[in-house]
């Protein structure tokens, strides 16, 4: 997997790996500035701040929405990525047009969210930059790398949940602990927006482990993630990779506002002296 981190002006954003189930739960998007070319980010419940993503799965459906646009569904072991290709994505449109499902497909593209005017649900999609046909081995390798990345994010997010730090203080502490800038920026936003619970993190952890077992032929299917990010409350987390994230020290050194000292009772009752 490519190194993670922020991309400065003129630099291409990293294409992250994540499962469709988590991407489908995403409902937060924002831009760092009002500049026309400022990147737009989608923040997932574990705090992944993603502008571009890379996914591999099975194209199960291609359909025409109108005269100019095709919609494709690319399914991984946990759910489906939806992609739209129109006149401004001619190569992707041509690829979808000639693809006969089912077919193993890799997609790199921009993460997007959309909320219809008559709905309170936020839908996610991928605006394709590139599409290519791949094989089952490529899909399996992607599943392993996506699972590893997911488990790492869960471990970082769990450490953040255990800390009293929030907002900019949490972002700074995560960055100083060596967490990549993108995840450090996303985790505080995720906790604030979704109220991500340890029960959700445990469900996502089980999903990632199921995906690994599926690739290893130890399981026939991945159990669904039934919880919303803010549901379920506290839960014990199963095994996670070790992450060197020390937020306790940052919390101890975080400045606190001391209450102003009350004046002594006697002096408070004394009238002010005359000039």
Where are these regions (language model features)?
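OB-fold (S1/OB) nucleic-acid-binding surfaces
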Residues: 48, 58, 64-89
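Short nucleic-acid-contacting surface segments enriched for D/E, G, S/T with interspersed K/R
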Residues: 89-108
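OB/S1-fold single-stranded nucleic-acid-binding modules
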Residues: 1-42, 202-251, 271
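Intrinsically disordered, compositionally biased tail regions
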Residues: 253-275
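Short, glycine/small-residue-enriched coil/turn segments at secondary-structure junctions
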Residues: 43-53
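Flexible glycine-rich surface loops and low-complexity tracts that mediate binding to linear polymers
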Residues: 57, 102-117
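Extended, charge-rich, solvent-exposed interface segments
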Residues: 98-104, 117-220
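Short, conserved beta-turn/loop elements at beta-strand boundaries and strand-helix junctions
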Residues: 62-67, 116, 136
């Amino acid at each position: 997997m490519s190194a993670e981190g922020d991309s400065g002006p003129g630099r291409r954003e990293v294409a992250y790996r994540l499962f469709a189930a988590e991407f489908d739960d995403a409902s937060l998007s924002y831009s760092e500035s009002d500049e026309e070319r400022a990147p737009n980010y989608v923040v997932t419940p574990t705090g992944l701040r993603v502008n571009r993503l890379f996914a591999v799965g099975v194209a199960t459906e291609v359909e025409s929405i109108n005269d100019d646009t095709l919609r494709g569904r690319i399914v991984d072991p946990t759910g489906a990525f939806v992609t739209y290709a129109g006149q401004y994505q001619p190569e992707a449109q041509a690829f979808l047009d000639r693809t006969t499902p089912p077919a193993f497909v890799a997609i790199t593209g921009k993460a997007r969210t959309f909320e219809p005017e008559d709905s309170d649900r936020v839908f996610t999609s991928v605006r394709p930059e590139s599409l290519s046909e791949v094989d089952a081995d490529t899909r399996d390798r992607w599943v392993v790398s996506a699972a590893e990345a997911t488990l790492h994010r869960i471990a970082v997010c769990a450490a953040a949940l255990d800390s009293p730090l929030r907002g900019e203080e949490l972002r700074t502490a995560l960055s100083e602990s060596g967490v990549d800038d993108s995840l450090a920026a996303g985790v505080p936003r995720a906790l604030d927006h979704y109220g991500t619970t340890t029960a959700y993190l445990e469900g996502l952890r089980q999903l990632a482990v199921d995906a690994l077992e599926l690739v290893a032929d130890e399981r026939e299917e991945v159990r669904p993630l039934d919880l919303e990010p803010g549901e379920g409350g506290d839960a014990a987390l199963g095994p996670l990779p070790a992450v060197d994230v020390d937020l306790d020290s940052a919390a101890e050194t975080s400045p606190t506002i001391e209450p102003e000292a009350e004046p002594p009772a006697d002096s408070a009752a004394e009238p002010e002296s005359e000039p």
